[in-house]
Swiss-Prot record:
The lineage of its organism: Bacteria, Pseudomonadati, Pseudomonadota, Gammaproteobacteria, Aeromonadales. ATP binds at G10, A11, G12, K13, G14, T15, R123, T132, Y133, Q200. It is found in: Cytoplasm. Its EC number is 2.7.4.3. This is Adenylate kinase. One of its GO terms (cellular component) is cytoplasm. The keyword Transferase applies. PROSITE patterns: ADENYLATE_KINASE. GO terms for molecular function: adenylate kinase activity; ATP binding. It comes from the Bacteria. Its main location: cytoplasm.
Amino acid sequence: MRIVLLGAPGAGKGTQAQFIMEKHGIPQISTGDMLRAAIKAGTELGLNAKAVMDAGQLVSDDIIIGLVKERIAQPDCANGFLLDGFPRTIPQAQAMKDAGVVVDFVLEFDVPDEEIVKRMSGRRVHSGSGRTYHVVFNPPKVEGKDDVTGEDLVIRADDEETTVRKRLDVYHQQTAPLIGFYGKEAEAGNTRYVKIDGTQPVDQVSKQLARILG
């Protein structure tokens, strides 16, 4: 079962990725983790990637595709894998297809921008422990204070509304076109494309995924 997850930051992909991994026993493949592992292992691709990164440049699609192919050939991917955060662009998706990487399911988590802004800009964190709250969905007992220590809660820079909106803009420019790409792939019978309403409660989304993935 080879799965690609699509959806804006804050759409709930991470939560459902955990559910899918546990239920189906397949690993989640993150390009960041792969890059770090390849650099640490000193593989040829890893050394190439390190040279590019040390020069302050972006790692090319060719190197990333090479890493993906290396990674999915490992024994723990025998029953499938879950790709999150890759491919991000149509050239990456095309290169993956050209490299013979088959995708069984593309799952798009659809959540309106304003809902994502509400979700992410409402997060509050206790710096000392990492405990996370939400002003709407999971408020602390005392506004702005950690339940355990009573210390102040902070907003992470990533969760500031302006940052969230910038990340959404990048997603719509770069990654949203993949929806069209994989839609066509599904029409051609090369994959199954499923759009999921990410505004549903978490357990409802998990149940829907269980029905889709079997």
